Amino acid sequence: MARVKQKGKAGAARIYITRNQALKKLQLTLADFRRICILKGVYPREPKNKKKANKGSTAPVTFYYTKDIQYLLHEPIVQKFREYKVFARKLSKALGKGELETAKRLEARKPTYSLDHIIKERYPTFHDALKDIDDALSMLFLFSTMPVTDKIGAATVANCERLCAEFQHYVIRSNSLRKAFLSIKGIYYQAEIFGEQITWIVPYKFAQSVPTDVDFRIMHTFLEFYQALMGFVNFKLYNTLGLRYPPKIDVAKSESAAGLAAYELEESSSLPAIVHGNNKNARKNIATLKSKIRDIVNSDANVVEQSEKTTEDADEEPETEENLDEFKPADGADNEDSKSLVSHISSSNTSLFSNFTFFLSREVPRFSLEFVIRAFGGKVGWDPILGSGSPFSESDPVITHHICDRPHISQKYEGRIYIQPQWVYDSINKGILERTDLYACGATLPPHLSPFVKVGENDYDPEAELSAEENDDVSEALDDNISGEAVPISKKNDEPENVEQIDDAEEEDLEHQRELEAEAGGVAYSEYVKQNSKSAKKTKKRQRDTLTAEEKEEKEAKELSKMMMSNKQRKLYSKLKNENSKNENYNNALRNRKRDIEKRKKLKVEN
């Protein structure tokens, strides 16, 4: 006979554990428990049946996996938390008694901990770390712009600024930046590093007000972990480029707001690090390295001579009757692969601004423009008001583009193009240099579209040009307007107006207006409803009569398949169909609006 399982000893009750039970098991306070969960990556779980997991109770509680809590029992940082509590109690006791020497001695022996082993546990490979640095970069850039308060220390802000600047220098040096988008929340960037798409947001450098309803203790715990993570990532990235980490900082330039120009990148020499180490075998290998290289070079030369002799002998031999088969690659797959490779390379044109030299006026955001221009190979100088360290002045003749954000320029220099900052971002996102006349100072800028939106097959593409029929409609409307006949171009003359394109509110207003007109004409409401239903039936009948035989068969087949569906499938089908029709109507309305805008533009040009 099978053994009867006791209640609460198996199943969900054993897999999950409540937060209060976890606190008792770990002997930690709630604040320390939250810290260790954030650092170790342990988060609450949602069981399928809360009542079974809570042993029959329906009280609202937070659940964790029992294995995760058991895993935290062996974490060394938990013991450090306990040691820190003892240290804080002794320090407060010494300060209360006025024993300053004892307090200094205790402060010198303050317990500290390292997050290195946690980083290695959570991210076994470098690619795993790259996949998870989006949030880390966003939070580091956020705290780098925060003011120093009693909740945010100066050392924290300075360390965040350093880590962010180091990462930006890597992106500039490796030409990894792909997209940049100006939004209301901030500036979105996307870089491609070792095949991983990394997206982060940088806030604008305005005066920040620290909110009072934010729990900075939890944010500081995340920030502590992200700082350790970015230290590892930056070290690995710099090593891949052969750069010394951390880079040197010019203190004088940094104090005078030089920004990225205050960092000096140096090439690292890994050979002395091996020579001065304690590995004797490495020293022996390096000592015999030259002789090995010489032997390899000589062997390669002998191989080349032998191959030349064999080719000469093959040329002297007569041709044989048996011809080898030539295997040509298929036109489809190979061409598609090559096209995709070429399109990928062209879409990520990393040397877009390599032939240009930019100068930034004092009213433009230097912190962003300097980064994106240098990431695409350009040279940048700026007004002294924006900070020191500019490589050239405003009057330098090497400047090709002058970026400003004002309607009129009092003094213009010959030989340079004056543009607004949006030209830089739009050129980066499209991978080509945009027309500069559209972005001239004081000009109405084209819409700044997000490069992160992927346009579907049937979606509206704002960058797509009008079709030939739509252009004909615009030209016909212009001719009619010139001749004095005002014809709207938002709908075609031969097609009836699509009522579904009108919003619900507008449709109700039109219906109410028709009812009022019928009432004013002396028509009763019941007769008005009958007339509307009759007209609707007539239009449906007219549409059925205009259908071809193939369309009728297709429609009947759809109706039959719909009849064979279950009630659930029929509801789902109608829901999807309604969503598609709504999207189509919305896209048509946007296309009509675009045609109206094109008409107004052409009228302005002609007038």
From Swiss-Prot:
Tell me which UniProt keywords the record has, alphabetically: Coiled coil, Nucleus, Ribosome biogenesis, rRNA processing
Q: Which SUPFAM superfamilies match?
A: BRCT domain
- Region Disordered: list its residue ranges: 301-341, 531-607
Per the database entry, which stretches of residues form a coiled coil?
A: 497-604
- The signal peptide annotation in the UniProt record is none
**Gene3D superfamilies assigned:** BRCT domain (3.40.50.10190)
Q: Does the keyword Nucleus apply?
A: yes
Comp. bias regions, Acidic residues? 313-324
- Give residue ranges for domain BRCT: 348-441
* InterPro entries (alphabetical): BRCT_dom (IPR001357), BRCT_dom_sf (IPR036420), PES (IPR010613)
GO process annotations (BP): assembly of large subunit precursor of preribosome; maturation of 5.8S rRNA from tricistronic rRNA transcript (SSU-rRNA, 5.8S rRNA, LSU-rRNA); maturation of LSU-rRNA from tricistronic rRNA transcript (SSU-rRNA, 5.8S rRNA, LSU-rRNA)
| Chief location bin | nucleus
Per UniProt, subcellular location reads as: Nucleus, Nucleoplasm; Nucleus, Nucleolus
Return any one Pfam family short name: Pescadillo_N
- Which Gene Ontology molecular function entries are recorded, alphabetically? ribonucleoprotein complex binding; RNA binding
Q: How does it assemble?
A: Component of the NOP7 complex, composed of erb1/SPBC4F6.13c, ppp1/SPBC19F5.05c and ytm1/SPAC890.04c. Within the NOP7 complex erb1/SPBC4F6.13c appears to interact directly with ppp1/SPBC19F5.05c and ytm1/SPAC890.04c. The NOP7 complex also associates with the 66S pre-ribosome.
Q: What does this protein do?
A: Component of the NOP7 complex, which is required for maturation of the 25S and 5.8S ribosomal RNAs and formation of the 60S ribosome.
User: Which family is annotated?
Assistant: Belongs to the pescadillo family.
Annotated HAMAP family: Pescadillo
Which protein, by its recorded name, is this? Pescadillo homolog
Source organism of the structure:
Schizosaccharomyces pombe (strain 972 / ATCC 24843)
